[in-house]
Regions:
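A beta-strand edge to alpha-helix "cap/lid" segment located at domain peripheries
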Residues: 1-26, 30-127
């Protein structure tokens, strides 16, 4: 497992624990999340969901990951399957997730993340 894959594993584990300190340490200052419904959160907004207890992730699996490196930057695309609640409401799902990762002072950190729901493919029908 390379450093980028290890970062992804540590990120998934930290989300499950709600470990704000670990998530803070593994992300750049201007980290941005684009959620599965198109909402955009900056780093503080993203971390506040855990700080306040609004988001509770009971299971997060990050698999089927493919990494492309570009010097001090990388893109990891994988499957993100979660069981979670947000403000007490179920927030389970399976998403295709894109992580943007950059090397800062010799350490890989998450700079951005985008989640897209994985749905069923429906071929077009003839008219």
């Amino acid at each position: 497992m390379n450093e980028i894959q290890q970062l992804g594993r540590r990120w998934a584990e930290a989300e499950q624990r709600g470990d704000v300190a670990a998530l803070d340490a593994m992300t750049v200052g201007n980290f941005t999340l684009v959620g599965p419904l198109g909402f955009v959160l900056d780093k503080d907004q993203w971390l506040d969901r855990y700080r306040t207890g609004q988001l509770v992730t009971s299971s997060l699996v990050w698999d089927d990951v493919h990494v492309r490196e570009y010097g001090d930057a990388a893109v990891a695309i994988g499957r993100h399957t979660q069981q979670a609640t947000y403000r007490g409401q179920p927030s389970d799902g399976q998403f295709r997730a894109t992580h943007v990762i950059v090397k800062v002072n010799g350490q890989w950190q998450l700079a951005g993340m985008q989640l897209s729901p994985i749905g069923q493919f429906r071929p077009p029908t003839a008219s």
